[in-house]
């Protein structure tokens, strides 16, 4: 019996199961992906204290608008139809919980794919993203696609050009060359959406650097970009500096909001940077943009980042802050930062992504480290035991034969305190 049949005939106990039984699936591919996404979604929303009605609302959105963007299920040999580098196991959706202001919020990140991805009809997987963002317009009336259309015109290629570009890089590079990614947050009674674009294919086509491509396309927004220029100039100053060169950090992609309402009447611009350096001093230099970002909030952020760094990553005892950690040779083993630009802001806001999958401690030690971090930040009474909730989530998810291993710890410090995020994956390789 396939995954879809198993779900639609299984005893009902959880909202994700009830939804499957009541609605069924368009095809076996969607049934397969729901069987992998449903269990961790249910457990993570229980962990985050979502009410039953809120779980149904979120699940209905994911079922209707994200599930079709997962593409074909893996073949009989376990190989994914189109591997994407959103997570270490190449699956098309990544799930996460964001801890902030006493609440936990479910997040998803998705690189849309379809049965045409990688074929002559869509050689580098562009059309699925367009289809996905148009599909969700019916339930996101505040969605504004002006910026999306601008950047798509800057980054997307016609089929013949895309096919030609594909022959110029190796297979891994093709998979890393994500043209577009959609991310969703699910606060109470709401859906927020971000879209990210990556300059890799345009760099192959033009020979320009990521920085040149990203800056040119952002400045191409014309008058829309004026409120962001001060913060963008600060970021550019560091990007071109000797400090950035020593830290081995470079911009790799950017994102913006598409649902413009309430606190997001104007989009943020988030520019993401990558480095393979892992010395903590280098992390501080990047986080503070070489000292351009200052003040008590930044200092508190650095201090909290150091606690989390040592709590979740496998940092040897007595390891010097100016020395890189023992190198992980995987091509995706890197630290990612993003710098958030708000309209009218003088400076960017930093965020660090700690590579727990490549440099982290064992799972349960990470969970202990998170409990220690929450206690150090005075948050242990707010969120409860991280380890206890993690173990409950993990053990029950594995009952459904789905992997849920933390792959990245994301750290952001606002004036109201730290915002750690746990990212999990759903991995066919563990079935």
UniProtKB/Swiss-Prot annotation:
Residues that coordinate or bind substrate: 107, 194, 268, 270, 272, 353
Q: Give me the residues that bind L-tryptophan, please.
A: 85-86
| Keyword Transferase part of the UniProt annotation | yes
CDD domains annotated for this entry?
A: PT-DMATS_CymD
- Is Chloroplast included in the keywords of this UniProt record? no
Q: Out of the domains of life, which is the source?
A: Eukaryota
GO MF, one term, reads:
transferase activity, transferring alkyl or aryl (other than methyl) groups
Recorded E.C. number(s)? 2.5.1.-
Q: Which InterPro entries match?
A: Aro_prenylTrfase_DMATS, DMATS-type_fun
**Pathway(s) of this molecule:** Secondary metabolite biosynthesis
The alphabetized UniProt keywords are: Transferase
Q: Name one GO biological process term.
A: alkaloid metabolic process
* Alphabetized NCBIfam families for the sequence: arom_pren_DMATS
| Its biological purpose | Indole diterpene prenyltransferase; part of the gene cluster that mediates the biosynthesis of the indole diterpenes nodulisporic acids (NA). Nodulisporic acid A (NAA) and its chemically modified derivatives are of particular significance because of their highly potent insecticidal activity against blood-feeding arthropods and lack of observable adverse effects on mammals, in particular the tremogenicity associated with the paspaline-derived IDTs is not observed.
The entry's family comment says: Belongs to the tryptophan dimethylallyltransferase family.
Which protein are we looking at? Answer: Indole diterpene prenyltransferase nodD1
Give the taxonomic lineage as stored in the record: Eukaryota, Fungi, Dikarya, Ascomycota, Pezizomycotina
Gene from which the chain derives: nodD1
């Amino acid at each position: 019996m396939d995954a879809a049949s198993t779900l639609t005939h299984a005893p009902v106990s959880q909202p994700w199961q009830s939804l499957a039984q009541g609605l069924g699936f368009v095809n076996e591919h969607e049934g397969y992906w729901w069987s992998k996404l449903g269990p961790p979604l249910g457990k993570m929303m229980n962990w985050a204290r979502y009410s039953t009605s809120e779980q149904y609302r979120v699940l209905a959105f994911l079922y209707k608008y994200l599930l079709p963007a997962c593409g074909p299920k893996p073949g009989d040999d376990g190989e994914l139809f189109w591997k994407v580098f959103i997570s270490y196991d190449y699956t098309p959706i990544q799930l996460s919980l964001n801890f902030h202001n006493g609440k936990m919020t479910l997040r998803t990140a998705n690189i849309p794919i379809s049965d045409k991805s990688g074929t002559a009809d869509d050689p580098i997987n562009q059309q699925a993203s367009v289809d996905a963002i148009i599909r969700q317009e019916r339930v996101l009336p505040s969605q504004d696609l002006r910026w999306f259309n601008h950047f798509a015109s800057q980054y997307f290629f016609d089929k013949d050009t895309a096919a030609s570009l594909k022959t110029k890089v190796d297979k891994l590079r093709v998979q890393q060359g994500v043209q577009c990614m959609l991310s969703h947050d699910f606060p109470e009674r709401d859906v927020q959406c971000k879209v990210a674009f990556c300059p890799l294919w345009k760099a192959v086509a033009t020979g320009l650097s990521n920085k040149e491509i990203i800056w040119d396309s952002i400045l191409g927004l014309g008058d829309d970009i004026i409120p962001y220029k001060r913060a963008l100039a600060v970021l550019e100053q560091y990007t071109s500096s000797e400090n950035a060169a020593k830290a081995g950090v470079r911009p790799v992609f950017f994102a913006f909001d598409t649902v413009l309402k309430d606190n997001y009447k104007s989009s943020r611009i988030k520019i993401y940077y990558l480095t393979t350096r892992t010395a903590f001093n280098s992390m501080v230099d990047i986080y503070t943009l070489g000292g351009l970002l200052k003040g008590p909030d930044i200092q508190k952020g650095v201090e909290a980042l150091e606690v989390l760094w040592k709590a979740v990553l496998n940092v040897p005892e007595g390891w010097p802050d100016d020395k890189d950690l023992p190198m992980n040779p995987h091509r995706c083993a890197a630290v990612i930062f993003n710098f958030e630009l708000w309209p009218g802001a003088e400076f960017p806001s930093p965020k660090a992504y700690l590579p727990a999958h490549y440099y982290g401690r064992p799972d349960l030690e990470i969970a202990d480290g998170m409990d220690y971090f929450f206690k150090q930040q005075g948050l242990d009474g707010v969120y409860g035991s991280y380890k206890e909730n993690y173990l409950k989530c993990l053990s029950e998810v594995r009952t459904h034969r789905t992997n849920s291993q933390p792959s990245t710890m994301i750290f952001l410090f606002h004036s109201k305190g730290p915002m750690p995020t746990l990212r999990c994956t759903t991995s066919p390789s563990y079935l």
